[in-house]
């Protein structure tokens, strides 16, 4: 295998990657026997696989079925060894025998996957899936029986003892009734788990001794093992197997989270404090935010259009794969052919390339990068929230929140840090969770932790406030809490960790959605200055949070002077050259350029106008709209000198034409008004541009959209209404 995977292979990294924990039941799909094997070599491979299964460790779940499978395979191993010892028979097998051995290899390989799945599964998950797992073992026995029935025993010249073992094995594969695959002990334990959920459903948490007994029988004896079970259930919720009962899994998840603090001593919090956030819990970073340049993106993972790592790979009608935003932009610009092959696009349907997305995600994992696929943000939060919608889950989460708030109030510094971390996770999903956590009085307690000398306590406290602020009524509670805004800005200025500072910026972004809070945030000493500094010097993630906060603040009519004196305008101008934040920066500048002083500051730089035109050419539809709006404000308020400078930009003619044809309604309007201003200008260069654009305008006289756009008067950029906040 090592020879087959060359250094240039895009999947070479998989050879160095530890096998991931299997999530899905592994019996569906096609399996193939190893090619090129036959005769004694194939038989040895089958015998080796059977022997390894017999000698393998027994998982705690499905022990009865695993033991029964091991007994059958022990008989099979004895039969295979008998055949191998008969050198005359092992020399050459008939085609029928080789075919049977290949099928036997497939059955054993599926058995190995099933046992491995059961061994790696969380105990709670295995209990919930017990009926499905039992059915899988029953299917394995049936498949093994079929192969043994067609095995040509006569041509293999089995000994008398081997023939007897074969008959016994065939009988064993058929003797078990379906009910015998279900372990009564596991069924009883599963029923006890369901009974605990029913008590929560009635609003009566189970007593601690019964929960302790239940966890002990499930093999969950420590806080760390309980946390591992919680992580595993979250992974299963996100994997969304087709027949998974998400509300039931979410209820068990909430029960285990309650047990984590109700059963295990929270004062011994070191294990929970040091427990790492799972990959699904971490706030996803941009590839461009890292400083590691010791690797290059495989060309197979790069979009042929943008040449960047594909975040959302999709397959076009020609069979070529592109990143979704890039191919959508290509189509919206009026192209009807495939960029890579040149073939005509039969339609505009785009099919997600999930296999490639999985490989890209694994590659990012190997190199320590986090892959923000479109399904991993909004979809993850929505999925977990939906799974916790049952009454039992909500009651368990409420009971957990009560314990955590008490820990915040009365615990040691170490316990408070753990409580803040768990509240952060509990507030990650579901408006009900965010509502009752705030109702229990968590916000003032979290605010106090912002002053903590413990970096983890501070980081988790500010992130918990961010997650709580997503619920609209909680924004008011945070802003009304005396000193809370000042403390959030303090973390933004002097936080112990980069993540704490970034989450403080994200919290300001979330709070700035409310119009009445914009001025309060702007007037808080240091708030706008620190956002501007983060926009200039922060990581990609920090810049994104900062620019979105500044964009929201810019929608306030009194923001211009504050933005100018705090150097936020300069930071926004510099950010036009950064693709990560250029679209939001252009939108903020368009809003701020109601003030002549800002217009001249922005328009005085040749690179600003060039950057805006570049964004009009390559940005998303919203980015193009922001860029053309900013350019419109420069032309409208900057005077004829700036109009002349705009008119000299190479390629502006083509960009304006493209936007008037394919842009958003507002972008078309602004582009048409830019054309009119250039035409009215008496400057020679502006007149030259105007004549060129007049030709374009006349050629499109029949275009109703452009004709309507040409009749529009001056318009203002409307304020943003909706936002999307990623939850750390």
Swiss-Prot record:
SUPFAM superfamilies: ARM repeat, RING/U-box. CDD domains: RING-Ubox_PUB. It holds the Pfam family Arm. It catalyses: S-ubiquitinyl-[E2 ubiquitin-conjugating enzyme]-L-cysteine + [acceptor protein]-L-lysine = [E2 ubiquitin-conjugating enzyme]-L-cysteine + N(6)-ubiquitinyl-[acceptor protein]-L-lysine. It is an enzyme of class 2 (transferase). This is U-box domain-containing protein 4. Possesses E3 ubiquitin-protein ligase in vitro. One of its GO terms (molecular function) is ubiquitin-protein transferase activity. Pathway: Protein modification; protein ubiquitination. Signal peptide: none annotated. ARM repeats lie at residues 441-483, 526-568. Keywords: Repeat, Transferase, Ubl conjugation pathway. Residues 296-370 form the U-box domain. GO terms for cellular component: cytoplasm; nucleus. PROSITE patterns: ARM_REPEAT, U_BOX. It comes from Oryza sativa subsp. japonica (Rice). One of its GO terms (biological process) is protein ubiquitination. It comes from the Eukaryota. Its EC number is 2.3.2.27.
């Amino acid at each position: 295998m090592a020879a087959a995977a060359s250094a240039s292979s895009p999947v070479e990294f998989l050879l160095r990657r530890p096998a991931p924990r299997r999530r899905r039941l592994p019996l569906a799909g096609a399996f193939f026997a190893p090619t090129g094997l036959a005769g004694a070599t194939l038989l040895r491979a089958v015998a080796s696989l059977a022997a390894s299964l017999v000698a393998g460790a027994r998982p705690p779940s499905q022990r009865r079925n695993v033991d029964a499978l091991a007994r059958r395979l022990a008989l099979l191993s004895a039969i295979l060894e008998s055949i191998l010892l008969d050198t005359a028979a092992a020399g050459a097998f008939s085609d029928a025998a080789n075919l049977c051995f290949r099928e036997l290899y497939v059955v054993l390989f599926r058995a190995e996957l099933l046992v491995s799945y059961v061994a790696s599964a969380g105990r709670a998950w295995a209990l919930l899936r017990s009926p499905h797992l039992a059915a899988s073992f029953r299917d394995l026995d049936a498949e093994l029986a079929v192969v043994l029935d067609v095995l040509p025993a006569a041509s293999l010249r089995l000994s008398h003892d081997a023939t007897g073992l074969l008959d016994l094995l065939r009988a064993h594969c058929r003797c078990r009734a379906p009910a015998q695959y279900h372990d009564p002990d596991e069924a009883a334990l599963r029923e006890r788990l369901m009974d605990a959920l029913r008590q929560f459903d009635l609003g009566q948490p189970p007593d601690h001794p019964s929960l302790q007994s239940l966890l002990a029988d499930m093999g969950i004896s420590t806080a760390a093992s309980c946390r591992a079970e919680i992580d595993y259930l979250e992974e299963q919720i996100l994997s969304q197997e087709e027949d998974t009962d998400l509300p039931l899994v979410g209820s068990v998840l909430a029960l285990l989270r309650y047990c984590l603090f109700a059963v295990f001593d929270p004062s011994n919090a070191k294990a929970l404090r040091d427990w790492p956030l799972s990959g699904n819990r971490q706030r996803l970073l941009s590839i461009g935010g890292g400083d590691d340049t010791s690797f290059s993106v495989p060309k197979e993972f790069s979009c042929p259009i943008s040449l960047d790592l594909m975040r959302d790979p999709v397959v076009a009608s020609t069979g070529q794969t592109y990143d979704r935003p890039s191919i959508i932009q290509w189509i919206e610009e009026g192209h009807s052919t495939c960029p890579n092959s040149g073939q005509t696009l039969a339609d505009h349907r785009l099919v997600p390339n999930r296999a490639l997305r999985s490989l890209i995600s694994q590659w990012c994992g190997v190199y320590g990068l986090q892959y923000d696929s479109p399904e991993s943000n909004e979809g993850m939060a929505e999925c977990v929230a939906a799974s916790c919608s049952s009454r039992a889950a909500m009651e368990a989460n409420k009971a957990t929140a009560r314990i955590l708030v008490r820990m915040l109030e009365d615990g040691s510094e170490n316990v408070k840090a753990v409580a803040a971390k768990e509240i952060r996770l509990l507030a990650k999903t579901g408006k009900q969770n965010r509502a009752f956590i705030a109702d229990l009085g968590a916000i003032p307690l979290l605010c106090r932790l912002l002053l903590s000398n413990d970096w983890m306590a501070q980081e988790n406290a500010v992130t918990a406030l961010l997650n709580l602020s997503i619920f609209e009524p909680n924004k008011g509670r945070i802003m009304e809490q005396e000193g809370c805004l000042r403390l959030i800005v303090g973390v933004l200025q002097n936080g112990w960790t980069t993540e704490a500072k970034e989450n403080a910026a994200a919290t300001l972004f979330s709070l700035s959605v409310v119009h009445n809070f914009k001025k309060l945030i702007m007037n808080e000493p240091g708030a706008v200055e620190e956002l501007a500094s983060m926009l200039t010097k922060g990581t990609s993630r920090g810049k994104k949070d900062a620019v979105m906060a500044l964009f929201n603040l810019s929608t306030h009519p009194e923001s211009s002077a504050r933005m100018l004196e705090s150097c936020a305008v300069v930071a926004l101008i510099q950010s036009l050259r950064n693709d990560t934040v250029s679209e939001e920066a252009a939108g903020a500048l368009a809003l701020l350029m109601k003030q002549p002083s800002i217009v001249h500051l922005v328009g005085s730089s040749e690179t600003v106008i060039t950057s805006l035109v570049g964004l009009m050419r390559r940005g998303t539809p919203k980015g193009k709209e922001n860029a053309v709006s900013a350019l419109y404000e420069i032309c409208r308020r900057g005077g004829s000198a700036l109009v002349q400078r705009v008119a000299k930009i190479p390629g502006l003619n083509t960009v304006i034409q493209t936007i008037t044809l394919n842009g958003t309604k507002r972008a078309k309007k602004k582009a048409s008004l830019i054309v009119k201003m250039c035409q009215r200008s008496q400057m020679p260069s502006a007149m030259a541009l105007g004549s060129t654009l007049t030709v374009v305008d006349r050629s499109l006289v029949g275009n109703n959209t452009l004709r309507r756009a040409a009749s529009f008067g001056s318009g203002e950029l409307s304020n943003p209404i909706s936002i999307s906040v990623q939850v750390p």
